[in-house]
C-alpha cells in the first residue's frame, strides 16, 4: 500500500540546517513504521520574505524559518528582530502563507548535540558548544567552522543514524 505524502516547507540560515533536514527526510522515508512519506522542502534563505516571494502557492501553506540568534550582542538581537519582521511581511504578501518560527538557540549545534547528550547549563556564546559537540561524537574539531565542512557534518549525521538503528 502506498503511503500518503506530506510536504513541509522550511527556510534555513545555512548549509548545516539544510543538510540536517535532508538527512531527517531520508530517515523518516526509509522507516517502515512511518505512516507517511515526507518531503521537507528546505531552501537556504536567510530572508523569509524572499523565500515566500519565490514560491508558487496554490493553497494555505506553512513555512518554518529555522535560524539562530548567534549571541546576545546588539547586532545579533537586531538581526533576530529583523527576521521576525520579515516573517510578518511574508505573511502579508497575499499568498496565504503562515510563517512559523523555528528558532534554534544561539546555534544549530545544540540540536545536533541533543541527539547524543544532555546539554545542561547556560551557554552565552556559540563557541561554548564545540566541547560538548566533540564529546558527544568522539571528535576533535578545533572550531565550529571545521565541524561545518560537509564531510564532517555528514559523518556526524551518519553517527546519529547508526545510533538510531541500535
Which residue stretches match the model-derived regions?
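Short, charge-patterned binding micro-sites
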Residues: 44-48
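C-terminal accessory helical subdomains adjacent to catalytic cores in phosphodiester-
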Residues: 1-7, 18-38, 49-62, 69-166
